Design a protein with these regions (language model features):
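C-terminal helix-rich "cap/oligomerization" subdomain common to oxidoreductases
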Residues: 1-7, 80-82, 327-380
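Glycine-rich, aromatic-lined ligand/substrate-binding cores of catalytic
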Residues: 200-282
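Beta-loop-alpha module in the N-terminal Rossmann-like domain of NAD(P)-dependent dehydrogenases
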Residues: 61-123
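Rossmann-fold dehydrogenase core element
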Residues: 119-137, 157-159
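Predominantly a Rossmann-like dinucleotide-binding segment in NAD(P)-dependent oxidoreductases
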Residues: 6, 17, 138-230, 284, ...
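Hydrophobic residues in well-ordered beta-strands that form the structural core
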Residues: 106, 112, 131-133, 276
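C-terminal glycine/acidic-rich active-site capping loop/insertion
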Residues: 1, 136, 237-242, 271-350
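N-terminal Rossmann-like dinucleotide-binding module
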Residues: 1-58
Length: 380
């Protein structure tokens, strides 16, 4: 039986030095000493693969140039496989691991659309398999504090939720170490669901579902191309209807100059409203219908974000993206320990196939709405 003092062993598939997300997963998984990355097939490029292993202290005998060989050789020696390849390559790896009954931690988006979800469902058994998808923004302490406030009814009956994630990367690629970080080739092609929805939209869907604990019932959407990359959706606007007459909107963009990552949540009830901005993650803006305005941070009267696990350093020292990701990895660790011990205990912050499916169905409906120029219903 696993206890919460034991490190679990991970093998990475993808996520090398030349990956967009690999180093973040490596750092976040180990920040709280819950996991150790002990094996990997980090890159198809042998030099990058070897360099990544050396950088991360992975022994050459646990380094593989082929992910299938990694699975075969390490399946009895690691506790989970982490899938960090580009999204279009997820499906083959996921189905292979499920058929072998091996635990999976998968970078979002899970796959490229509902058709590939159906392939997963054909070999997935929720009572037998472990599949966690990493949506890290709900790992921020003040987002979790907001969820706590909503459950307490602090904002009253929710009426509106607006989520946005504007970025400028297609118009102004970030300069990293003197080199422009150009979009990866796979991001310049759309699939069953447009790639911008796989990249940014699934985060917005996750946050809305996490906070409201419900799915939208219908959407109307407008897709646009504003970049130099032809026939590629790079800007999406969506209106949403939810149960209980809740209205919502989502905006995601890769061509919004001035926004490195402008992720923002605004939520309105009949007693108050809240705003959280990812570039100022330790503050939650609250407004009440008696005129009070409040900025709540970890040093304030928090009832959830004041936990020790969210305060690796005392308030006044801002937390960041990797720490939020590490919060999620700790949640995954706890649920994975229960799974490996044969106990059925679900963590409230770990999400898998069902939410991934709902998100991809939403954006498939948005694509259809853009084509029909009309509202599209979402069916469970």
């Amino acid at each position: 039986m696993n206890d919460n003092n034991k490190q679990l062993k991970l093998a990475f598939i993808g996520g090398g030095n030349n990956s967009a997300v690999g180093y973040v997963h490596f750092a976040a998984s180990q920040l709280d000493n819950k996991f150790a990355v002990v094996a990997g097939a980090f890159s198809r490029n042998p030099d990058e693969n070897s360099a990544t292993a050396q950088r991360w202290g992975v022994s050459e005998k646990h380094l593989y140039n082929d992910w299938e060989e990694l699975v075969e050789q390490e399946k009895n020696h690691v506790d989970a496989f982490v899938i960090l390849t580009p999204t279009p390559h997820h499906i083959e790896v996921i189905t292979t691991l499920l058929k072998a009954n091996l635990p999976i931690i998968c970078e979002k988006a899970l796959v490229t659309g509902p058709a590939e979800v159906a392939e997963i469902e054909a070999c997935y058994d929720k009572n037998k398999h472990f599949l966690a998808v990493t949506y890290n923004y709900s790992g921020y302490a003040m987002v979790r504090e907001l969820k706590h406030l909503l459950k307490q009814g602090a904002l009253g009956n929710i009426q509106k939720i607006h989520l946005e994630m504007p970025q400028e990367g297609f118009r102004r690629p970030p300069d990293i170490a003197g080199k422009p970080s150009m979009p990866q080739a796979w991001r310049l092609k759309d699939f069953e669901v447009p790639t911008i929805c796989l990249d940014l939209g699934v985060h917005l869907h996750h946050l809305s579902t996490y906070l409201l604990e419900m799915e939208p019932t219908e959407t109307i959407a407008q897709f646009t191309n504003h970049s130099q990359y032809p026939n590629l959706i790079d800007d999406v606007n969506m209106l949403l209807n939810y149960p209980n007459n809740i209205k919502g909107s989502m905006w995601m963009s890769k061509t919004a100059i001035g926004h490195r990552n402008g992720l923002q949540i605004r939520i309105y009830g009949d007693k108050g409203s809240a705003r959280w901005f990812q570039l100022n993650p330790d503050e939650l803006e609250l407004n009440y219908n008696d005129g009070r305005r409040e900025i709540l941070d970890r040093a304030g009267q928090c009832e959830y974000a004041n936990q020790f696990r969210y305060n690796r350093m005392k308030p006044g020292h801002p937390t960041g993206f990797v720490e939020a990701f590490s919060n999620l990895y700790t949640d995954i660790y706890e649920e994975l320990c229960c799974y490996l011990a044969g106990t059925d205990k679900k963590n409230d912050y770990v999400f898998g196939l069902e939410q991934a499916k709902d998100g991809l169905n939403l954006f498939k409906a948005a694509k259809k709405s853009n084509e029909s120029r009309s509202w599209e219903e979402l069916k469970k």
